[in-house]
Design a protein with these regions (language model features):
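Acidic (Asp/Glu)-rich catalytic clusters
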Residues: 28-29, 52-57, 74-95, 119-129, ...
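C-terminal segment of N-terminal export signals and the immediately downstream linker at the start
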Residues: 20-46
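Active-site acidic/histidine proton-transfer and metal-coordination neighborhood
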Residues: 85-92, 104-201
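Hydrophobic faces of well-ordered beta-strands that scaffold small-molecule active sites
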Residues: 32-38, 63-65, 93-97, 133-135, ...
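Glycine-rich, proline-tolerant flexible connector loops at the mouths of alpha/beta enzymes
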Residues: 64-83, 140-144, 148
Length: 350
């Protein structure tokens, strides 16, 4: 890849082709970049090569390593071996990491300055042939900290500015996820514009909007111009006495309009990877009828909130989630992920 190549959403497909792996359609009616966010099956005890084998077993074209732990470390030679193994089997690889914000609760300051840590992941992405590095700011915690959300955003943007030249030299797009309650779509979109949409994009996660009292479609409408990869997740929401109960479910078993989300995602973001992510043991009570809930959400537009609440009004109360042992969790993850693959393929074929 040429020095200082800027990757935008429209050029991600070309970057994949440059790896030498065909971007032709995969199994059946799959989009050519349908695959798996490996966080879905993180408890299996697999190494990077076994994750590739899992993709081959299910005729998946793309996998995304969530972080260095999932990959098995950031040693350059290891990344080269994983790329070679994946290339031989026709599997495309994307790389991920955690926070890129030095003030976020997810950053461990004992690691030292955050910039070198980020650059190690960028280098791993380059060696893996990943055109994107999935990253994030934080979580819902950053809405409630003494430091306002806007200050966390400023710290992240400063970090990005410091790294722009080095990252673009390596030809990697920094792809910020709307993650675990940190940003609504309307908040993340202007951040991409300010950072520079020629080298910073979005990993759209369709499950995380419910953690920010947002309809997944609303988030998609805001973020579509910037999406370079995606986590396809389903959710179920229902109204409660104090607000809304929300949980992630097996894809196809939710009530938040994923058929329409998938249709719009494919239409408006044709070059983005569609990566199934399955998490089914998380529950959140969003007590939106209590005034103290709204700290950190003061600027949410009423019309957008009501689109979210309308989804909850159509839901029915669900039974409590089971408490699982470590072994049961591993089985549950694999079973639910595999069922999600079956379900999303039915939707592709519809």
């Amino acid at each position: 890849m040429n020095r200082r190549t800027f990757l935008t959403a429209s050029s991600v497909a070309a970057a994949y082709s440059a790896t030498g792996v065909s971007t032709a359609s995969g199994a059946g009616n799959d989009p050519s970049r349908f695959g798996l966010d490996l966080w879905s099956v993180r408890s299996q005890g697999w190494n990077a090569f076994q994750y590739v084998d899992h993709a081959v077993e299910h005729s998946l074209k793309v996998i995304q390593f969530a972080d260095a732990n999932t990959l098995g470390g950031l040693h350059p030679e290891h990344a080269r071996k994983v790329k070679a193994y994946a290339d031989e089997r026709g599997v495309l690889v994307e790389m991920g990491m955690g926070t890129i914000c030095p003030t976020a609760s997810g950053w461990n300051a004992s690691k030292g300055p955050i910039e070198p840590w980020i650059l190690r992941h960028v280098e791993a992405a380059r060696l893996l042939g990943s055109p994107v590095l999935r990253c994030l700011m934080g979580s819902a915690k950053e809405r409630k900290t003494e430091l306002p959300l806007e200050k966390h955003t400023e710290a992240m943007l400063k970090t990005l500015r410091n790294l722009r030249s080095q990252v673009t030299d390596m030809g990697v797009v920094m792809a910020i996820e709307n993650h675990s309650g940190d940003y609504q779509g309307r908040e993340l979109a202007p951040i991409i514009e300010e950072a520079g949409k020629d080298w910073v994009g979005v990993v759209y996660d369709s499950g995380n909007p419910i953690w920010t009292i947002e309809d997944p479609m609303v988030a998609l409408e805001h973020l579509a111009p910037y999406i370079v990869s995606s986590h396809l997740r389903d959710s179920y929401v229902w109204a409660t006495e104090e607000g809304v109960a929300a949980r992630w479910v097996v894809f196809g078993e939710g009530n938040v309009g994923m058929k329409d989300v998938l249709r719009v995602l494919l239409e408006r973001c044709p070059n983005a990877s569609i990566l199934l992510e399955t998490i089914t043991v998380r529950h959140n009570d969003l007590k939106v009828k209590r005034s103290d809930f709204w700290k950190g959400y003061e600027n949410v537009p009423a019309n957008e909130f009501m689109r979210f609440y309308a989804l909850a009004e159509k839901g029915n109360p669900q039974p409590p989630l089971p408490k699982l042992t470590k072994e049961e969790m591993a089985v549950r993850q694999l079973t639910d992920s595999n069922q999600g693959i079956v379900n999303v393929r039915k939707m592709f074929a519809a």
